[in-house]
Regions:
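Non-transmembrane functional regions of envelope-associated proteins
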Residues: 1-138, 171-251, 256
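Substrate-access "cap/lid" subdomains that shape
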Residues: 124-168
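Aromatic-anchored segments of alpha-helical transmembrane domains
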Residues: 254-266
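Loop-to-transmembrane alpha-helix initiation sites
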Residues: 268-271
């Protein structure tokens, strides 16, 4: 299987360079994807993964950072664990790609998927309205919003093990394993619509949707479609308002159609 570690290690080990050397050797024996983060306080650019770009330039649509906090440890892949909180401070969507120094950098979950199938790069498609989709060969197309973000969900259960349980009885047969920290004061949980989640839980959530092709996403045409449907229904109700025998059935039918359409869009991963 493919292993990933969401613990950030941007600085040398305070116990000495020997500890970093031991970690580097361990990563040579057991390849893993490491987590990096894009930062407004960094100026250097991290390791770059090749990208096949289709359509326009995606840089103008992506979240941009001046630098990437990085380390020199051996790793088969590196992915970013940055989140993008909404106006209320709650994280509901995560970017799959960000920009820095004129280059593209994939998220941790996307990098886990790329390394898992052994592909040297991933594909990104950009249209006039923004980022349209990303793709790892052998897996479904990943539809995103115009900024390459997808929605996270809170209804997925994962098999979990503590470090002590893993040492006594290591997990076997898993295609992907993500290691994270839950110690208070060491890592801060991320506020989400489903409650506080640890970074490795968010990445596991995104990875699950990427593998199954079920990541909820709001297409760029969704706001215009919602406005158009609302105006059409209002116009129909205004025309039939003086005839209750017409307006009542139309109103009930409209409510039912909106509920059915919303459920269908959600099940189709378009909402």
């Amino acid at each position: 299987g493919t292993a990933g570690v969401t613990v950030l290690m941007p600085d040398p080990d305070i116990r000495g360079a020997g500890q970093d050397a031991q970690l580097a050797m361990a990563l040579l024996r057991n390849p893993a994807v490491l987590a990096y983060t894009a930062s407004n306080q960094a100026t250097q650019v991290g390791p770059h993964v090749g990208t096949a770009q289709l359509g326009g330039d995606p840089q103008e649509w992506l979240y941009q950072y001046p630098g990437i906090l990085r380390t020199q440890h051996n790793a088969v892949g590196v992915g970013l664990i940055n989140s993008s909180p909404e106006l209320d401070g709650v994280v509901r969507r995560l970017p799959l790609v960000v920009g820095s120094g004129g280059k593209l950098f994939p998220s941790f979950a996307l990098e886990m998927l790329r390394v898992g199938v052994g592909d040297p790069s991933y594909q990104i498609s950009t249209k006039e309205t923004g980022i349209e989709w990303l793709r790892i060969p052998s897996f479904p197309v990943i539809n995103t919003d115009s900024n390459s973000r997808i929605w996270i969900t809170s209804n997925i259960n994962f098999h979990r093990q503590t470090a002590a349980e893993f040492i006594q009885q290591p997990m076997e047969g898993a295609a992907f394993v993500i290691f994270g920290v839950t110690a208070e004061g060491v890592v801060n949980p991320v506020p989400t619509a489903g409650g506080a989640k640890y970074p490795h839980e968010l990445q596991a959530n995104v990875l699950h949707h990427l593998i199954n092709g079920t990541s909820p996403v709001q297409p760029v045409w969704a706001p215009a479609a919602e406005l158009g449907v609302a105006l059409l229904l209002i116009l129909i109700l205004l025309v039939t308002a003086s005839h209750v025998y017409f307006s009542a059935p139309i109103f009930i039918t409209s409510i039912g159609a909106l509920i059915y359409g919303s459920l269908h869009a959600y099940e189709s991963s378009y909402l």
